[in-house]
Amino acid sequence: MSLAVSLRRALLVLLTGAIFILTVLYWNQGVTKAQAYNEALERPHSHHDASGFPIPVEKSWTYKCENDRCMRVGHHGKSAKRVSFISCSMTCGDVNIWPHPTQKFLLSSQTHSFSVEDVQLHVDTAHREVRKQLQLAFDWFLKDLRLIQRLDYVGSSSEPTVSESSSKSRHHADLEPAATLFGATFGVKKAGDLTSVQVKISVLKSGDLNFSLDNDETYQLSTQTEGHRLQVEIIANSYFGARHGLSTLQQLIWFDDEDHLLHTYANSKVKDAPKFRYRGLMLDTSRHFFSVESIKRTIVGMGLAKMNRFHWHLTDAQSFPYISRYYPELAVHGAYSESETYSEQDVREVAEFAKIYGVQVIPEIDAPAHAGNGWDWGPKRGMGELAMCINQQPWSFYCGEPPCGQLNPKNNYTYLILQRIYEELLQHTGPTDFFHLGGDEVNLDCWAQYFNDTDLRGLWCDFMLQAMARLKLANNGVAPKHVAVWSSALTNTKCLPNSQFTVQVWGGSTWQENYDLLDNGYNVIFSHVDAWYLDCGFGSWRATGDAACAPYRTWQNVYKHRPWERMRLDKKRKKQVLGGEVCMWTEQVDENQLDNRLWPRTAALAERLWTDPSDDHDMDIVPPDVFRRISLFRNRLVELGIRAEALFPKYCAQNPGECI
């Protein structure tokens, strides 16, 4: 009896144990499946190589060139080498230089790999200062190449994204080459099939480093492979042409995520020159303040796109951020805060940095209108009222937007202050044949409150001529060859001599003033509000009233705008068009949006003014090839830390031709 009970108990214990073991096994199996499922969700198409390391999902694709288009196909590994998107794009179809060369280009289909440490410079010029400036430009060229490699290291591949490293300041960072970074990680140093890249830059003629609309910007570039060495030669007549050659060379180099090396063409030839002399971007730093670093970042993009004029709208009625040596009261009374100011050193630093990238800084102190905050201290200094209508309400009676403010045209101290500021700015930015006086949107009702003059427009004319005379005194008694003013009711008269003044036309492209200004003999710079104003289309920023301008100007709008063709200008009139400029007024833009509001739309203007491609196919439709090239250029901007706006879904960027 006791034996039977013992047996039953033993069987019960065994059964319980078996059930427990089966339960544990079943539960573990479920967990394993769940983990595998979750991992599959996280890495939907992950594979492993022979050593067991996971293969990134993007490397399961390769690209092949068919009918000048890169086609994405599955890559199964062992028999054929994977071709990355960027390497396919750079060797398939038309030349991938932005802006497109105007004269001659030839790129081989064969490419070579190398590391940034393999690149060396030799300068051939009779001018010592040009040699020094080219060495500076080349140093920054190498830093840009290192930045591209650094960006890839932190996780970007053939289609870049804005990484943590690229969002930080790029101008004083101690960046190491990517080959070194990868070597430290994997224990080996990557070596390309080139052992040396020798860059020779020859400046044949001018030793002048001063900016002028007469600068020779032409250049020739060639590369030739000799064994394991690549010979690069850039030939130009001036520093400015040579600098554009460096920008082109930078666009002939790319970073391949397959071997983590830089690549370029085995052989190439480019001969290039701009169609227009003035290729500008205007940034308003009064309505919002922008740091020196953000301005430099903008200039980097301009240099890569071969733009040559940074128009710095330094002050306006909203604020006066510039700290004048002679009249610091302007910033004390006019800046938003102590930290939101530009010192003399800041302006010099920006100008010197811009020259490295072939960009001239053109500062503008708008006058007599658009001058309010910062100008209210005159009576305390015994200088009388320097400005009128400052912050006056209702603002719509006395200015175009709040706050109001207009300089006093009958106070001699007003002109003395302007002369001193002009003198300072010319010292900071260097000798020039171009200066901007402002001069637009004067509200005559403001002055009418204070003066009984029957010809208030004549008072406006007198002010501009006085400002011109003071500029001449500030410039050692010589007026710059081109003194610019904004188009206005005043430029519709013959008050300002056409031999001295250039008009920046901001009104609509169909307005009669476009024709009248040319007929009256003025040189012009086009900045039409309906095409090249980049602040439009974001709605009204006031509680009442419509937006200042709408709709949004797409990069296609910017690109297709050819006013000289649509106006059917003859050769004489077209010669009066110095070029064009996109404008970024900053009522609704601060440093957080600057990059994506500017880029890549500004690049669209760059090609319009450098290349001026024809409208043979359609005046309104952008050719598909342009989409592909500007997409690649946009990616280059992102690699340099510029947060350029996306053009279309990433799928479309990786599959050219399927979306457009």
UniProtKB/Swiss-Prot annotation:
In third instar larval and early pupal brains, expressed in cells sending projections across the interhemispheric junction. In adult brain, expressed in mushroom body, ellipsoid body and pars intercerebralis. One of its GO terms (molecular function) is beta-N-acetylglucosaminidase activity. Keywords: Developmental protein, Glycoprotein, Glycosidase, Hydrolase, Signal. It is an enzyme of class 3 (hydrolase). Its EC number is 3.2.1.52. GO terms for cellular component: late endosome; plasma membrane. InterPro entries: Beta_hexosaminidase_sua/sub, Glyco_hydro_20_cat, Glycoside_hydrolase_SF, Hex-like_dom2, HEX_eukaryotic_N. Pfam families: Glyco_hydro_20, Glycohydro_20b2. Belongs to the glycosyl hydrolase 20 family. This is Probable beta-hexosaminidase fdl. It comes from Drosophila melanogaster. The gene is fdl.
